[in-house]
Amino acid sequence: YLAKDGLAVLVLERLDKVGGAATTDEFSPGFEGPMCAYWLHLLQGKVVDDLKLREHGLEMSYTISPGDNSRRIHPFPDGTFMGGPGINSDFELANQIKQFSEQDARAYFDWIQFWEASSSILHPYFLTEPPTISQLVDSVRGTSREEVLEKMLTWSYIDLIEDHFENE
C-alpha cells in the first residue's frame, strides 16, 4: 500500500536466502515446511485483490478451513506425529489425542471454541485501524466473549495451554 501511494519502499532480507516466511526449513527432524506459511490464512482477499498479488505470482494451493486437519501435523521428538494426511476432521484428531489422554481429547474441542471466539472478537478489525483496548472491551462487555478477551489479553500462551490440557 505504501508503494501504491507513491512512497519509496525498500525490502531487506535478513536471511541468506530470499523468501522470508515462505522459505522451507526443517522444523523437526524429518519434517520440512514453510515456517510461517500458516499465517497465510490471515491474508485477506481484499488485500490480495487490491495489490493484484495473483498477477504478481501469488499462488496458494490450498486453504485450511476450520475442522480441516489434513494439512496440520504435530511431530514429536521420537519421530511419531499426530494429524497430517488422512486426518480430515477435528473428531479424527481428537481420537488421536485420546491415545494419550481422554481428558485432553475432550479439552481439544474447548480449545477450538476458545480460538473461534478469539477470532470473532478480532476479525472485524482485520481491515480497519486497530481498536483501542477500551474499544475491544466495550465490544464484548456483557457477552460470553468477555472472559475470552480477558484471557487473550492477560494470559500467556503456556497458561492457556495448561488451563485446557493436562499433557504436553
Go through each PLM region and give its residues.
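Short polybasic amphipathic segments
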Residues: 70-76
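Structural motif
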Residues: 28, 76-77
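Rossmann-like flavin
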Residues: 77-168
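N-terminal FAD cofactor-binding segment of flavoenzymes
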Residues: 25-70
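Residues within well-ordered alpha helices
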Residues: 1, 46-54, 96, 160
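Glycine-rich FAD pyrophosphate-binding loop
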Residues: 3-28
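Residues at alpha-helix termini
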Residues: 4, 28, 49-50, 99, ...
